[in-house]
C-alpha cells in the first residue's frame, strides 16, 4: 500500500514522504490515526507543497535563530543578582531557567522561552560564573556566561 505521511513516524519517515507499507499496517494503524493518507496525484502535489513550505520555514527559522544568537553573544557576560546567605554566600534556592530568561531580557537581550534554556546537570546554588546553554534551533546552541552575584 502506497501512503503519504501527514506526520513524522518513527522508523518510517517524515511529513510529506511517500512510503510503501504493508496493507494491514496502513489500514489498521496509520490511516485511522491520521498519520498518513492514501497516495494519489492530488495528494502527492499537496505533499510536495507542504514539504516546500516546511523547507522555507526551516530556512527562515535558521536565519531568525542566527539573529537571536548574535544578539545574545553581543551581551557578553550577564549579571544575575540573587539573595544569598550573609555568612556562607550560598543561594536561597537555586537559579531556574526563568531567572536566566529574565536576566537576559533585563540585560537588553531578546525575549526567550524558558523551555529552550538548558541548565547544567548540577543546580546553580553558588555565587560565581556559570555557563548555560540556550537551544535556539536544532542546529544552533548559544553558550551564555552567567555571573551569579549576591544581591545588595
From Swiss-Prot:
GO BP: translation
One GO MF term attached to the UniProt entry: structural constituent of ribosome
UniProt keyword annotation of Nuclease present: no
Protein origin, superkingdom: Bacteria
Gene3D superfamilies for the chain: Ribosomal protein L9, C-terminal domain (3.10.430.100), Ribosomal protein L9, N-terminal domain (3.40.5.10)
Keywords assigned: Ribonucleoprotein, Ribosomal protein, RNA-binding, rRNA-binding
HAMAP family xref list: Ribosomal_bL9
Family in the record: Belongs to the bacterial ribosomal protein bL9 family.
UniProt function note: Binds to the 23S rRNA.
Name of the protein in its database record: Large ribosomal subunit protein bL9
Organism: Mycobacterium tuberculosis (strain ATCC 25177 / H37Ra)
Lineage, highest ranks first: Bacteria, Bacillati, Actinomycetota, Actinomycetes, Mycobacteriales
